[in-house]
Amino acid sequence: MRRGLLLLNLGTPDNADIRAVKLYLREFLTDKRVIDLPTIPRYILVYCLILPFRSPKSAQAYQSIWTEKGSPLLYHSQNLVTKLQSALKDEYKIALGMRYGTPSITTALAELKDCHSLTILPLFPQYSSAATGSAIEKTLSYLANQEIIPSIKIIRDFYQRPEYIQAQAKIMKPYIKDNFHVLFSYHGIPERHIHKSGCDTLCPQTCTPIYDKNQACYRAQCYQTSLLLAKELQLGTHQYTTAFQSRLGKTPWIKPYTDEIFAELISKGIKNIVVSCPSFVADCLETLEEIGIRAKEQWEKLGGEQFILTPCMNDHPEWIKAIHSIVNEQI
């Protein structure tokens, strides 16, 4: 009997025109785990305020990174599946499901319907309800309606796994030069999501080490990721900074904000930076456009000189080896 491996990621529009982007954003932003408001206020916010104004801007952003192969997130993810299947051979049958857009989680699970056991790996190193939680919920809701439910294993997060840290560090290392400051930029989430994760307090600066009460805290996991990467890369505490990007709306999101940390770094005399985005395993809008284009322009306008964005792990051989190890340890 065959084992199934379901890889989950967030998703991408089918193409970069306004209509496709609007459809994608509608599915994404009406998710109750993403915008955690009651249904009616959430729909009013999304349909009346966000979609009419954000869709054209987002479409323009997607167009700036779209390639002949299509969406970078999608083709990197598909390449990962192909290479991982080749590496794992008959150990697993692998399918890719996107929480929003295509290929859908439903389609991916249909591909794995003959598997007697299923390992679910959301490709989000750090746990958040809005990304990991939503993808797992969608998967389990589909499985709950099946006549035969396979044995299920869920890998909730893997930020602390040595294989992930080593793979991320190996990809970063060639880009780190003398006199360059390293910025770890993670996707942000609203502060209220932190309180919902079980944390009693929101740490004013760096988060405390992981313990029982903050083990599901996204911000704490991000800071722990930075600490582990810095150790692997042999960076001193003064050689790197952690920040959070991609905030939406006017409510407080976890800090410090990536777009506000640049001025602080410049004021300290830092002119050259290497930026890595460890919460993203594949290059996408948030890495290529938000950081690779807009953040770089901002850095240069502030007087910064060199700005290097390291690639995500994408379908790198070290990442494939890491997934193989992480998945097999769950058996």
From Swiss-Prot:
Superkingdom of origin organism: Bacteria
Annotated localization: Cytoplasm
Pfam families for this protein: Ferrochelatase
Annotated keywords: Cytoplasm, Heme biosynthesis, Iron, Lyase, Metal-binding, Porphyrin biosynthesis
Record has Nuclease as a keyword: no
EC number(s) reported in the record: 4.98.1.1
An example Gene Ontology CC term for this record: cytoplasm
MF GO annotations: ferrochelatase activity; metal ion binding
Example GO BP: heme biosynthetic process
CDD domains attached to this UniProt entry: Ferrochelatase_C, Ferrochelatase_N
Catalytic reaction annotation: heme b + 2 H(+) = protoporphyrin IX + Fe(2+)
Coiled coil: none
Binding site for Fe cation: 187, 286
Record's function text: Catalyzes the ferrous insertion into protoporphyrin IX.
Similarity comment text for this entry: Belongs to the ferrochelatase family.
Entry protein name: Ferrochelatase
Species for this entry: Legionella pneumophila (strain Corby)
